[in-house]
Structures are given as C-alpha cells and as structure tokens.
C-alpha cells in the first residue's frame, strides 16, 4: 500500500485528487492533504509518504521546493506534479 500526500492550495483540486487516489484502495491511501508546502513538511515525518502529489505554485513553499525537501527526507518517494500553467519551464525545473 502506497502512502500518498497531496499538497495544493486549491481546496477543490485537493478534494478531487483525493477522490481519484481513493478509487484505488488496494494500492493507495491518502495520509495527508495540505494547502501549502510548509504544512506538508511540518507533518511529513509522522506520515512517512511514498508518493507526493503537488501543485507547482503554492504559498510559502513551491511544489518544486517541496519535492527537493522530500527527496532528502524520503529518497525513495515518487512525485507527481499537477498544474494549470501552460509554461513548460516549470516541468523542466521539476525534472532537474
């Protein structure tokens, strides 16, 4: 069972992502939903996530910074980036 954290500053998006993940209860469980990267980091040590689903632009800490932080704390964690932006430079930055 993969443990998933969702970080997105839009509540509707967080809720929709959570619903999508929960369609696979044998494989995934959502262990935390956060409206910003700071809250995700503050709660991550007790949640021990395997997967991060994050927006790129959020208050306090960007999704890219959040991924970088989690890669140090949880090196095997996988990340999924969601964004409404059409600027592909965010994707290139996230892949670095």
Language-model segments: what does each one mean?
Residues 27-35, 43, 91:
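Short hydrophobic/Thr-rich beta-strand motif most characteristic of the beta2 strand and flanking loop
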Residues 11-32:
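Two-component/phosphorelay signaling modules centered on CheY-like receiver
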């Amino acid at each position: 069972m993969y443990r998933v954290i969702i970080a997105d500053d839009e509540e509707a998006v967080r809720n929709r992502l959570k619903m999508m993940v929960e369609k696979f209860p044998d494989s995934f469980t959502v262990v935390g939903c956060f409206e910003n990267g700071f809250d995700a980091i503050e709660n991550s040590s007790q949640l021990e996530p395997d997967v991060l689903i994050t927006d790129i632009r959020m208050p306090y800490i960007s999704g890219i910074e959040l991924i970088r932080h989690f890669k140090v704390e949880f090196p095997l964690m996988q990340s999924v980036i969601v964004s409404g932006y059409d600027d592909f430079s965010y994707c290139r930055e996230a892949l670095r």
